């Protein structure tokens, strides 16, 4: 068993990169991620394979967890930890929230099947379409608690063992049996864990007013009938997406959450025994809790100061004297002071003194130097123009005096 994992400091570093590219969005598309991935100087063929591995849910975009996977693969390739892009994603790199997608994909690769068809049409009025096979982590944890509390010595669940749960649900008996038949195509007296989780997921959606699906994804059916999932790396393929994330709230406040009453009776709420393998991102700081990236914050502060200085300079320059003419002496003095201030900032940035001391990295220093340098050049140009104007005014004054 490999003891590798993505360390917390890596996750924080990847977050800074991800947040700067995503601009507040939860996912990166290929064009947004291309700049940072191509900086690795890996070949396009390698980067394509890395993208396919990291895009666990196969939606063509990378969320933060998938971006961490991609970055770790790239760094391992660049640093020589990997000689080539692996054919499948190593178990230690699989995000826990997507482990079921990978497992189902591996089962499908071992035994591809066609969808199971349910012939009976559900014409119950008032039910909604839009059933989603994706299991949110909170729902999956609840399903596993119910499974752990009712499984037999072989790790299987019988239909009758969940009767107390059925009684607590707002689901007709015919629909419960229809869902059971859907996950138990071989009509076995008991079903395994994967089938149980799918069965409870169907009941959960039916409890919330959604129609029971008429088909099962082939990847799920394979895991039901095989009774176990093949974890041989050489036999696996990239996972197939099950569906998008759904809403976590019940459609009506009059109904209890699926299984809550039942779990409360059992006294096992919050004691699920299942621990998925892979990278756990649960300790990662969420978006709203992350501090702004230090570089962006300090850059915005510098820009705000520059704008304030420019506005003050513009205001003073345009302020008329008592005789209606601009005070060029004052303007020249202020321009020289601002130039001196910017040159001092530039010198501090180059020497690593003053504010530049506070742990700024080389890239930020270079960016600040370029920015301040451009500002200094602009001020010098502005000062030269003002000097020309001043000289022209003095020349006009002398000419006027000479004519008198």
Curated annotation (Swiss-Prot):
SMART domains the UniProt entry points to: EFh, EH
Span of domain EH: 10-100, 139-227
CDD domains: EH (cd00052)
Regions of compositional bias (Basic and acidic residues) in chain numbering: 313-324
Keywords: Actin-binding, Calcium, Cell membrane, Coiled coil, Cytoplasm, Cytoskeleton, Endocytosis, Endosome, Membrane, Metal-binding, Repeat
Database matches in PROSITE patterns: EF_HAND_1 (PS00018), EF_HAND_2 (PS50222), EH (PS50031)
Residues forming coiled coils: 281-404
Residues in EF-hand domain copies: 42-77
Main location: membrane
Positions of transmembrane segments: none
Binding site for Ca(2+): 55, 57, 59, 61, 66
GO terms under cellular component: actin cortical patch; cytoplasm; endosome membrane; plasma membrane
Subcellular location: Cell membrane; Endosome membrane; Cytoplasm, Cytoskeleton, Actin patch
Annotated membrane topology: Peripheral membrane protein
GO biological process: actin filament organization; endocytosis; endosomal transport
Origin superkingdom: Eukaryota
Region span, Disordered: 306-327
Annotated family: Belongs to the END3 family.
Oligomeric and partner information: Component of the PAN1 actin cytoskeleton-regulatory complex.
Name of the featured protein: Actin cytoskeleton-regulatory complex protein end3
Native species: Aspergillus fumigatus (strain ATCC MYA-4609 / CBS 101355 / FGSC A1100 / Af293)
Name of the gene: end3
């Amino acid at each position: 068993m490999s003891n590798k994992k993505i360390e917390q400091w890596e996750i924080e570093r990847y977050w800074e990169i991800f947040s700067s590219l995503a601009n507040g969005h939860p996912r990166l598309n290929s064009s947004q991620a291309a700049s940072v991935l191509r900086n690795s100087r890996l070949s396009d063929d390698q980067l394509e394979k890395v993208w396919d591995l990291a895009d666990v849910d196969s939606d063509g975009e990378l969320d933060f967890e998938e971006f961490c996977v991609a970055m770790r693969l790239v760094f391992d390739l660049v640093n020589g930890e990997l000689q080539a892009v692996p054919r499948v994603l190593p178990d230690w790199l699989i995000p826990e929230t997507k482990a079921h997608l990978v497992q189902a994909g591996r089962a499908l690769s071992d035994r591809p099947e066609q969808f199971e068809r349910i012939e009976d049409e559900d014409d119950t009025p008032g039910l909604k379409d839009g059933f989603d096979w994706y299991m949110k982590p909170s729902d999956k944890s609840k399903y596993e608690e119910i499974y752990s509390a009712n499984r037999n010595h072989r790790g299987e669940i019988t239909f009758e063992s969940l009767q107390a749960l059925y009684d607590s649900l707002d689901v007709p008996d015919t629909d419960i049996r229809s869902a059971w038949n859907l996950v138990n195509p071989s009509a076995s007296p008991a079903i395994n864990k994967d089938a149980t989780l799918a069965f409870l997921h169907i009941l959960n959606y039916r409890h919330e007013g959604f129609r029971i699906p008429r088909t099962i994804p082939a990847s799920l059916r394979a895991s039901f009938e095989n009774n176990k999932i093949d974890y041989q790396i050489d036999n696996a393929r990239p996972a197939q997406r099950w569906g998008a994330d759904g809403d976590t709230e019940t459609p009506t406040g009059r109904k209890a959450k699926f299984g809550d009453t039942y779990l409360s009776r059992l006294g096992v709420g919050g004691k699920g025994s299942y621990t998925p393998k892979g990278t756990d991102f649960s300790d990662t700081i969420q978006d709203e809790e992350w501090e702004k990236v230090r570089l962006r914050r300090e850059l915005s502060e510098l820009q705000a100061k520059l704008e304030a200085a420019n506005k003050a300079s513009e205001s003073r320059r345009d302020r008329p004297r008592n005789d209606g003419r601009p005070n060029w002496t004052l303007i020249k003095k202020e321009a020289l002071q601002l130039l001196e201030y910017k040159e001092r900032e530039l010198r501090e940035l180059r020497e690593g003194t003053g504010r530049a001391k506070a742990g700024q990295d080389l890239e930020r220093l270079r960016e600040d130097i370029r920015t301040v340098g451009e500002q200094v050049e602009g001020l010098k140009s502005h000062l030269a123009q003002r000097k020309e104007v001043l000289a022209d005014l003095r020349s006009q004054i002398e000419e006027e005096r000479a004519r008198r």
